């Protein structure tokens, strides 16, 4: 029996979903004011490359296999401020009803108004994610959340990467891969080229 099976059921897998530039930047792909940390001035850089036919289909396919979402605090707050106002759109309705987790030491339960959301404290991150990973289920999907993703990669708690590699170099910004002199091998499982030049790639942890 595969190590990814749990009493005959596939265990939950941790997948990272990112819009990413050629130089590895994931900061603020969706909006001008999404994240200006570090003086970042290219907010919304990914929007002109979005191909609904290819990229939209890939997002829909991944969401169908996703049982829960995990966010860092900043990304969760951006999402919580946007998606509830888009009720009626099928993807927005899915975002609003799916189970969500947010990693934060500052949010209180009263702040978690984008239901259903459960708060995970930073000190409990590895333990909580490992526990979720050991449950039967589909994907635990992490969108954006660069600092959180780096932490999970460094702890070897990532099973798959879903990357939309966009034909642009941004010259600076937040990245997701740890700078820790550790090699981590991934196997390419699928690749599709969008009409806008975006490479839609899926990788799974190798070895």
Kindly label every feature range from the protein language model.
Residues 6-157, 167-207:
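Portal/gating segments that form or line small-molecule/metal binding sites
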């Amino acid at each position: 029996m595969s190590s990814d099976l749990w009493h005959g059921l596939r265990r939950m897998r941790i997948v990272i979903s990112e819009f990413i530039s050629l130089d590895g930047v994931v900061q603020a792909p969706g909006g001008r004011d999404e994240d200006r940390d570090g003086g970042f001035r290219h907010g919304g850089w990914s929007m002109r490359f979005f191909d609904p036919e290819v990229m939209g289909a890939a997002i829909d396919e991944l969401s169908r296999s996703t049982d829960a979402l995990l966010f860092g605090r900043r990304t969760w707050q951006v999402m919580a401020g946007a998606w509830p106002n888009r009720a009626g759109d099928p993807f927005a309705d899915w975002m609003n009803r799916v189970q969500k987790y947010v990693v934060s030491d500052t949010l209180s339960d009263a702040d978690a108004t984008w239901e259903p959301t459960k708060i995970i404290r930073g000190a409990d991150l590895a333990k909580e994610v490992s526990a979720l990973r050991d449950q039967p289920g589909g994907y635990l999907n992490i969108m954006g959340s660069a600092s959180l993703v780096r932490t999970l990669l460094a702890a070897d708690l990532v099973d798959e990467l879903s990357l939309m590699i966009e034909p642009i170099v941004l010259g600076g910004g937040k990245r997701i891969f740890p700078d820790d002199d550790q090699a981590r091998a991934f196997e390419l499982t699928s690749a599709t080229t969008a009409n806008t030049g975006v490479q839609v790639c899926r990788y799974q942890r190798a070895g």
